[in-house]
Amino acid sequence: MVLPKSKNQIGLGRAIQSDFTKNRRNRKGGLKHIVDSDPKAHRAALRSVTHETDLDEFLNTAELGEVEFIAEKQNVTVIQNPEQNPFLLSKEEAARSKQKQEKNKDRLTIPRRPHWDQTTTAVELDRMERESFLNWRRNLAQLQDVEGFIVTPFERNLEIWRQLWRVIERSDVVVQIVDARNPLFFRSAHLEQYVKEVGPSKKNFLLVNKADMLTEEQRNYWSSYFNENNIPFLFFSARMAAEANERGEDLETYESTSSNEIPESLQADENDVHSSRIATLKVLEGIFEKFASTLPDGKTKMTFGLVGYPNVGKSSTINALVGSKKVSVSSTPGKTKHFQTINLSEKVSLLDCPGLVFPSFATTQADLVLDGVLPIDQLREYTGPSALMAERIPKEVLETLYTIRIRIKPIEEGGTGVPSAQEVLFPFARSRGFMRAHHGTPDDSRAARILLKDYVNGKLLYVHPPPNYPNSGSEFNKEHHQKIVSATSDSITEKLQRTAISDNTLSAESQLVDDEYFQENPHVRPMVKGTAVAMQGPVYKGRNTMQPFQRRLNDDASPKYPMNAQGKPLSRRKARQLTALELGVSPEALSSATSKKHNKKNKRSKQRSGVVIDDY
């Protein structure tokens, strides 16, 4: 039953109308109407204000002083350069930064261990080490915050530096292992100074690992630079040595290097001339043995300390020297956690120091990512490293290696001629199917991680030139990049020619293979949705029911059931009558023969089986 409607129109609509009537303006005053910008301005006059933001304070002061502001849009200039990545420096800024870093490079040191002797207790030594480490951290912070230098992320754990101190104190020769693609970045000159401070008789040696990535001309340039600056060095490749160990080859040479071309080890005069060839394991072992021949009296074994940045190949070098995997190796920086001692021979022992990131000047963090110092999987900002990679690797090399098409903005339209990060990442992501689910756009972050890892691993190769190289870095790597493009184009041309030589022969051969295969496998049937397919001999005679019309047609497309004049199938009753006429029986007899009514009788009554049992 519907409730009676109230005659008193009391409700929300009446309240809204009443409020509108009270607050409507007075039309007798004319068309002029003054409205406060803030509807609660009358309440704000009585509100206590104890704190204001900078913007509110500025506006309130201007309002009290009755100051009017006029916007002068013609004096505003918007500086916008979409082609310049904000996370990278321009060429002029990078040059100024390099010049400033060269003037202050002596201020960037490594922490020193305080002097101690037999009378120093463990508590006193721990306190002195902590104070020295804190003072070193304080000086670096002042260098960054006050003077604005960009310092690479360095090791902040005191325990790791203690491992380095112990390795230097125990070692007779400190071997710095550096990456051949950028040796000066991974070489620490302050470490060499500290080694001489700890023991004047200690010696420094530079082992340039991953030298197989450099061409012969590039190694010649670096060799001349090291010789001019009196830096003892040796080119080495731990990967090639490990592969040769697995093959069991006689490691005489990688590049026709004979035993008499072994660079002389560091003697007192240090006037040796080093070769630009890649040294073998026998050469490296010979240098270590020649060092050990200069042992002082009373010492039976010489210790070599291997130090360097993470992921430069310290553990791989030790494994190649020993001949088996004695040290844990990983592509993740910082795998070795504490120094380890390995006996190479009766006179030589090796100390594997954990990888340390020494403090050094850097222009941007993109350089640290491409040098393999910062882990790529933990990277958040990827446009800077990707743009720097696109500057170093030519567009043709990227297109050749990854079979993509990079379209850049023409110079006539304001482009720089160098692809940006998005112009490289988007085509690569589309070609690999890396798409974002929520927007449907290419997943450039995932593409950036793959390309950056290829750069760090050496697939995208870029070698930094020495400081005395007269030309640019692109000219220094021109030979290697041209080899990649020409080798890939030659292989593609060879495949096309090989395919076009004998198409008929290839097709005939493929037909023979198909015939032989299907004769040996007669029970092969198509894997399609439907009922099981019957196979009778080697000939396929089954038929899956995939469409409704298949039930009414035979294999030759003839109708399976009788049709009427209109081409439609007969009904069940008419089809039964037609069948009865063809068989010469009545339709009732045909229906009774196929009927199921004999199974539908009354089952509640008593059933007689009809079997007679004889009485005996």
Curated annotation (Swiss-Prot):
Stretches of Basic residues bias are at 595-607
Function of this protein?
Answer: GTPase required for the nuclear export of the 60S ribosomal subunit. Acts by mediating the release of nmd3 from the 60S ribosomal subunit after export into the cytoplasm.
Keyword Hydrolase present in the record's keywords: the answer is yes
Its family? Belongs to the TRAFAC class YlqF/YawG GTPase family. LSG1 subfamily.
Q: Name one GO biological process term.
A: ribosomal subunit export from nucleus
Name where it's found. Cytoplasm
Keyword terms, alphabetized: Cytoplasm, GTP-binding, Hydrolase, Nucleotide-binding, Protein transport, Transport
The lineage, from the top, is: Eukaryota, Fungi, Dikarya, Ascomycota, Taphrinomycotina
* Domain annotation CP-type G: ranges: 161-359
UniProt GO molecular function: GTP binding; GTPase activity
What's this protein's name?
Large subunit GTPase 1
Q: What gene is this protein a product of?
A: lsg1
EC number(s) given by UniProt: 3.6.1.-
Q: Single GO cellular component annotation?
A: cytosol
Any keyword Glycosyltransferase? no
